[in-house]
Structure formats: C-alpha cells, structure tokens
Amino acid sequence: MDKTTTSDLVLDNDNIGSNAGSAQEPLTTNGKTSGVRNRYKQTVKRGRKGSQISPSKTYPLRSSHSNVRVLRSASKKKNETPIVPTNDNTAVQRVAKKRKRSKPLRPAPSRVLRSTSEKKNKAHNELLNDGAGVQPAEKKRKVGRPPKGGTPKDDYLMIRKRVRYVLNRMNYEQSLIQAYASEGWKGQSLEKIRPEKELERAKVEILRCKSRIREAFRNLDSLLSEGKLDESMFDSAGEISSEDIFCAACGSKDVTLKNDIILCDGICDRGFHQYCLNPPLLAEDIPQGDEGWLCPACDCKIDCIDVLNELQGVKLSIHDSWEKVFPEAASFLNGSKQIDASDLPSDDSADNDYDPTLAQGHKVDEEKSSGEDGGEGLDSDDSSSEDSESSEKEKSKTSQNGRTVDDLGLPSEDSEDGDFDPAGPDSDKEQNDESNSDQSDESDFTSDSDDFCAEIAKSCGQDEISGPSSSQIRTVDRTDGSGFDGEPNAENSNLAFMETELEQDMVLPISSKRQVERLDYKKLYNEAYGKASSDSSDDEEWYGNSTPEKGNLEDSETDSLAESPQGGKGFSRRAPVRYHNNEHTPQNVRPGGSVSDQQTEVLCSNSNGSTAKNRHFGPAINQKLKAHFKEDPYPSRATKENLAQELGLTFNQVTKWFSSTRHYARVAATKKENNIENHTAENNNNTNTVDSIQLRGSNDIVSVDRNDMVSEERTGQSNLNEGTPLRSDTSCGQSVAVTPMVHPENQGNDSSSNVRTPNAKSAEKLIPGLENSDEARRKAVQRELRKMKTGR
C-alpha cells in the first residue's frame, strides 16, 4: 500500500534512539488524515548520487525482508548524537570506514570493497573511483625473530635459556648412564644388555654439555668486564670519588637529578645511568637502606649459578670465575682441538733446518726394504739390518757435491741440466755390486743348512741334499721309512727335511698331480667290523643269478629258527621268499575277486646258518649258539659269560641273541597254530587250496636244500588230479610263517603234510599269468628284505 504526504520529513532523535533495531522510522504529519497512522521510511539507495527527499515524492513501504540497507546506531553514544544524513555519499563512506577498521585491507590500489549484491558493488566502485575511498592500512608487523641488533638484556636472557637447556640435556644423558650403572634389586640389573656404544655417546655428550655451559659463563664474564671501574680508583676502604664514576653503558660522567649514576653491588664494580638501563630504573624502584642493587649482568650470573647448584649439586658462588665451572670439560676441549706438536718444528727453528736428503733417503729405505722382504724371502731382522746399512751407504753416496741423487742415478727434480757430473758414481755398477753382495750374503746364510743336509745324506748313503725336491717329497709320501736302513735313519731324514723346509721361506710349487695313495676300503672295513661279508656285498644278491653260497645263507636264516623246541620261528616282517618254496593255506575267494585271508608256510632245509641280524657271527658260532639254545633256551649268566669267552663275543651280544631267538620262536609257534586252525576250518568248509609258485633264476627252479630238491611238476600234477585250481598269490602285505623242514624220520609224527613244488614249465602251461604274479611277489619280498637289512 502506497501513501503520499505533503509535509516535510522530520527526523526525530528520540524515535531513532528507541527504534534503532527496526528497519522503519515513524514520521509525524499535520493530521489531515485522522485515525490513520502514516509511516514513512527513509531510504538510501546505493548507486544513486545526490538523491534528495522531496515532499511530493511517493515512498513505497517495504517489509523487513527488503535488501535495502539503512544506517543504524551501533552504540548508545551514537544514538544520542544527531545523525543527519546530509549526503548519501558521506553515509556510504562511513560504512566503508567502519568495515576498514574491522578488517584491514592490504595496500593494493587495484582492489576494492565488494558486497554480496550487485547494487552494493556498483555503489562501492563509484565511491572509490570518485576519490572518496578508504586510505590503505599500515603494514602489519611480522611476528618472528627479533632484529639482529639485540640489546644487552636480550643477551642475558639468551644466556639464561641456554644454560637451563644444556643442564636439562645433561641430566637426561646422566640418567641414561645411571640406569645401566646401578645393580638394581638383588642384582637383577646386571643381567640387562648394556648398550656400550650408546653409553659412550652419552658420556661424550655430557662432556660436550659441560663445555657449552663453561662457554656460556665465559661469555657472561666477558660482558661483566665491559665498562668496569679500575681498582686503582678505589681507596683502602673500598670507596671511590663521585667524580671518577662513569656510566658503563654510555661512558659519560654527566649526572642529573632524575638521571643519576647507580653503582652495582655485585662483583662487576660498574655504574649505570638510570635511563641507560633497559628498562629504565625509576627513582621509586631504587632499593632503600642497606639493600643492594644488582645490574642485569650480575643478576643473570646469580640465576645461572643457582640453577647449576640446584641441578648438578655443585657449590659455586658469584665470586667464582668461569674457569671454576666444570674444569674437567677443559681437557675435553683441549683433546678435541689439540694438534700433535711432535711433528711440528720448534718455534725457534728456521726454514733452513729442514734437510730434504734425509726425508728422501727415508722414503727410499722404506721402498727398498719392502721389496727385499717380498722378493728374497730372508728373515725380517737380517733384512732390516742389511737395508739400514745399504741405505746409509746410499745416503753418503748420493749426497756428493751438494746435490741429491736418487736410486736410478738421476738428479732431483729441482736440479738443472748443468748439475750433471760425469765423474760421479755409476748407479748401474752400484746396483750390480749390491746384488752380488746380496747373493753372497744369501749363500752364506744357507751354507750351514747345505752342509748339514750333506752330512745327513752321507750318513744315509745318498747324494748331497741342497733342498727339498719333488722326488724327495714323493719318496717321503710313498714310503713309510722303508727306503732307509733303520728307524733312526728315517727319523733323521725326516728331521732334516723339515729343517730345510723351515729354513727356506719360499718353496716352488710342483707342477704335477698330487701323489695320494688309494685307500683299501675292504681292509678298513675288515679292521672295523671283522672279516664277515658286508652289507654292500649282500646287496648284490638281489639282482642276477645268485650263487649257492648266497642261497645257503638265506636258507640258514630260517633253519636257525626251525630247530627251536617250540617247533618253529616266525618273522614279524616279510620273509625273503625268493630263495624258498612257499606253501599257502587255502584262501577264501570272494565274489569280487579279493583275497580275504592268506597264510604262508615256508619249507626250509636243516642247513647251518644265522638270522639276518646275527649273520655276521659266522656259521660256526651260530651252530654252537643253536646247540646251546636247544639244550637250554634260558641259560644262566655264567653260561652266557662262558659262551662269550669261548666264541669271542661280548656278554651283551650273547644275551641279545638268545632273547631275539626266543622271541621269534614264540612268534613262529603262534603263526603255526593259527595256520593249522585255519587249514582245518577251510577243509571242513570244502575250500580249495592254492599253491603259489615262485620262479627263481633263468631255469625257474627253486632250491630248498642242497640234498632235497622238490619239483614243481609233481605238486602241480597232484593238485590238478585232486581238482584244486592253482592261483598266484599277489598279496604281499602279510607276513610269512616259516615252518621247519620235515625230515624223513619225522614224517610219521608230523601232522602237516609235505607239499612238493612242481616244475615251473608245467605250471606255466597249466596256470596263465603265473609268471607275472610271481615276479611282483618277488619284487615285494626283495623290498622287505632291503628294509630289514637297512634297519639293522
């Protein structure tokens, strides 16, 4: 709603003060429109220059959400003063200045104040362009390090800080050392690992800190000595005339009523003007009575001494000089900076004291001595003495006619061409003479050893010996004293050989193969384990045609256990079936073709032998042991000892043999009983028996005993006549029960029937695939026997 008025616009200060927070100001009119309250708003539109309020102009009423900005009072004082906006430009300038104070601008003439609205931006741009803008603000002072030209007060403050910091650092390092130095409760800290390098570093750091504190006190004493009054100015009572007192800061003696010179009551004996101090010393701050006053330097020294006494436990006073502060740090500083003065010339020596010939001759001696030590191989003591003598001769020769000559006979680098003297010594001749003298010395050196070797050679019936040769080395290696007449001669020759080798430093290498005698391993084995056959020889019997001796050894393994009173002996592992004829009990064949049960009996001859573990005793020893085992399986200790002495065995070996034989006899008896029971049960159930045939060698003949040969053909024919099918037993997982061979005289008493093995050829014709199955079984048995031998 728009309102018009013809009255003049009047500003009411009271209304402005009361309505400072509102966006509108009430104005009074003449009252022609009664009952209606006319409200008018004074607006200042930015961007319009010289806008004036006329009574005939219409002013629209706007809400409080309008973006038009008006002047408002910020405080009560401003509200009390009349605000008469005579010009819009002045109002805007005040707003701009107010913003300038709240947020200072950078002194950039191109930047202007910008508002959030476009109208405000236009108003500010026009005002600044007209020249009525805000003046640039002053540069803000940077906060950082103080200027380099510091005052004495700053120096004292830095000394305080430095001393306190270095003391704290030193206490830290001392605590580290004390932590490892103490033994702890009940000495437990002694077990800790000590960081030696770190502790050494801490000790060095402590000395460095002490030296820094000492340096700080030295600087402080130097500041205390500046402007100090001479002691001659003081009388015997310690008083000084006022005319002689001057200011230590400015050096002036002028004194005014408000700028008097005050003497320090410390140790510096200096005076200062009141206004020369920083900060100035006012009259009311001067101590009254007997109370003393200290200058800033003395005050700083007292503070540093108090901190030092508190943290380090020392007893220093203000009267002590800086040299008494940590005197042990002086040695550290001197040790790090001192130079070995032994290599330097004396102070009173001149330049002509230096003799270049001595230094050059010293270098030549070193080079020559090192060359002779590496090439000739003489003793170090003799070579050094000879080198020193030769060097002295060279020095005397080279220093002729006031010039220096090196080893090659050439003049020194600083000499001219005219210095050559044709009458001088010839260097080539000198070198030849020296080489000849060296050779003569060497020959003299080795003459004694040569004579000694010649005498030894004559005593041994040999030619003269000059040194260790390759032929002598070979004869010494190959012969064990056989080339000499007797043992004393051999010892003397070896002694001479060692002495000649020791006397010569370098022995030329021999360009030939090393003469090493081949070792007889069989002899060594026989010495260590006796003359019995070794395991390496037994391994050969697994492949190829075996000899009758090897077969007898395998047969003897079972025969040694077959003669036990229990009637047999069994193996806990698989038996070596290759050299035996196996009889298998009948098997239950399932519909699926798997073998449910398998038992094996091995028929063996009654030949002499031993078990796999006891085979190294020999057949004679095993025969005697088996005879005693038949008589008494549990012999007494005395019997065992007698057997051990008689057979040349130890008591433990005899005891182990009897225990193992008893064990395997019990196992064999158990297996035999189980086989008989199974055989009876299978016969009652009308099961078929199967005989597995093992082919041996190229002739496919299995030899059970030398005297008793069983043919496979008869057994196979009998089995065919009986109507029992033959099958090859391919199962190798079960153990083989070894049964004793039944002799003709015991056939009537033995309940078990003898099974004769037929010939392999007829069996192959009757049973297909028999050869392959027996080959697989043979390999499995070989593997088991290898395990038994290696596990021994």
Curated annotation (Swiss-Prot):
Its main location: nucleus. It is found in: Nucleus. Keywords: DNA-binding, Gibberellin signaling pathway, Homeobox, Metal-binding, Nucleus, Repressor, Transcription, Transcription regulation, Zinc, Zinc-finger. The keyword DNA-binding applies. One of its GO terms (molecular function) is chromatin binding. It comes from the Eukaryota. Gene3D superfamilies: Homeodomain-like (1.10.10.60), Zinc/RING finger domain, C3HC4 (zinc finger) (3.30.40.10). Expressed in roots, leaves, stems, panicle and seeds. Residues 345-354, 373-389, 433-453 have a biased composition (Acidic residues). Residues 116-127, 362-371, 774-792 have a biased composition (Basic and acidic residues). GO terms for cellular component: nucleus. Residues 1-154, 338-495, 529-599, 677-697, 711-792 are annotated as: Disordered. One of its GO terms (biological process) is negative regulation of transcription by RNA polymerase II. Residues 610-669 bind DNA. Residues 15-36, 51-67, 716-737, 746-760 have a biased composition (Polar residues). A zinc finger (PHD-type) spans 244-301. Residues 38-49, 95-104 have a biased composition (Basic residues). InterPro entries: HD (IPR001356), Homeodomain-like_sf (IPR009057), PRHA-like_PHD-finger (IPR045876), Zinc_finger_PHD-type_CS (IPR019786), Znf_FYVE_PHD (IPR011011), Znf_PHD (IPR001965), Znf_PHD-finger (IPR019787), Znf_RING/FYVE/PHD (IPR013083). Coiled coil: none annotated. Plants over-expressing HAZ1 show increased length of the uppermost internode and panicle, due to enhanced gibberellin signaling. Belongs to the PHD-associated homeobox family. This is Homeobox protein HAZ1. The gene is HAZ1.
